[in-house]
Amino acid sequence: MSAQLAAATPAIASEAAFDTMLAELAVRRTEFREQRHVPRDFVATLKRAGIYRSATPAVFGGEPQPPAVFLDRIERISAVDGSTGWVASFGSALVYLAALPYDTQAQLYADGPDVAFAGALFPPQAGEPTARGYRLDGRWKFASGCSGADVLGVGMPGDADSDGKPRTAVLRPDQAEIVPEWDVVGMRGTGSFDLVVRGVEVPREWTFVRGGTPTVDEPLYRYPTIAYAAQVLAVVGAGVARAALDHAVRVGGGYAGVTGAPKLADRAYYRDAVARAEAELRSARAWFYEATGQVWDTVLAGDPATDRQNAELRLASAHLARTSSDVVARLIEVSGTAPIHTTHPLQDLAGDALVPKQHAFLGPAVFDAAGAVLMGLPATTPGFR
C-alpha cells in the first residue's frame, strides 16, 4: 500500500462511518425526540464516526479537525436531526478541557481519545473551598447530551485566580444525579436535563477556566474558544434551515391545499419566498465559513486571532443563527394551512431552528458587543472572548 493511500484510508473509513451514522439517524430521529435524549448506543455510533475525537489533542491520540471541517459535519448531522446535531456539536467542547492541567488531561484520555463531554454551566454556583479543591452542592440546567456523556461539567463563578472568568468543574457521571426535566418545543431530543450535585469534592486540578490558557500547544487550541463554542451551535441552525428548504422544494410541486388553489410551486409568492430564503441562508453561511477560514489561516501562521477577527466570528455566528430561524419561519408563512398540524415537518424544524438563536452565545447582545469591537471599543458583554 502506498504511503499516500495509507494516509487516506483513515479518512475514507471515517467518512464511511459518518454516512452510515447519518442513515441510521434518519431512521431513529423520531425515537430520540420521543424519548427526549440521544441514547448512549447512538453516542457510540457518533464516536465511531470520529465526532468525539475531533477536538481531542493529537498528543493524546485525538484527530483534531480544522474548525470548518467539524462545523460542516455538524451541519450535515443537523440537516437530518437538529437535536442530534446539537448533542454532537459538543464534540468540540474538548477545546475547553485543553485548559485543564496536562497531567489531568492525560488521565482523562487514558482509555482513549473518544470522550463525550456534557456541561451544565448555568446558573454558576460557587463551591466551598477545601484543602484539595472545591465542595459542590447545587443544581445546574441545560446539560445537553448528559445521558450519553463520559464526563460532566458544572459551572462555577469566576474568582481571583481565574481573572474573573467562570470555572468549570469536571465530574464523573456517578457524581451527579440527572433530573430529566426537559419539555420544550425545539431540540426535544437533546436531553438537556438538569444536573444535581450533593456534597461532591472536586480536586482543583479537575477544574478549568472557560476560555483559559490551554496547556496543550496545538493549532486548534489557539483558535478562539468561546467563538468556536458559539459557532458549533449556530451551524446546527443552518442544518435545520437546510432541511426546511429541501422540504419546501420537495413538496412545492405537489401540495395544492383543500381550496382548489394552485400548487405551491405555481404560486409566485411561494417561489419568491423559497428563492429569497435560499439566497439568505447561503449568503449567511458563506460569510460564516469565510470568517472561519480566515481565522484558521491566522492561527496556522502562528499568529493570535485579533479582537476584530473574534468579533467577526461571533457576529457571523449570531447572524447565521438568526437567518436560519427566519428562513424556517418564512417557509411556514407561505406554506398554507398544512404547517398548522403538529405532525407537519416544518413544526419540528421551526422549534429546532429557534433554539440556537435564543442561546446566550448567539442572542441580541452579541450584535451590540461585536459592533463595539468593530468600532474600536471594548466589548459590551462579559465573556465575549
Per-segment meaning from a language model:
Residues 1-23, 384-385:
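Basic/polar N-terminal segments that are highly enriched at the extreme N-terminus
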Residues 26, 30-33, 283-319, 329-340:
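C-terminal helix-coil-helix/basic helical segment that borders enzyme active sites and/or dimer interfaces
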Residues 38-48, 52-149:
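Glycine-rich flavin
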Residues 139-176, 336:
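DPxDG-like acidic metal-binding loop motif
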Residues 185-187, 192-282:
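Glycine-rich beta->alpha junctions and the first turn(s) of the following alpha-helix
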Residues 239, 275-282, 314, 318-325, ...:
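Generic structural signal for well-ordered, non-transmembrane alpha-helical segments
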Residues 326-333, 364-368:
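Short segments within alpha-helical structural elements
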Residues 337-385:
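Glycine-rich phosphate/cofactor-binding loops in nucleotide/flavin-utilizing enzymes
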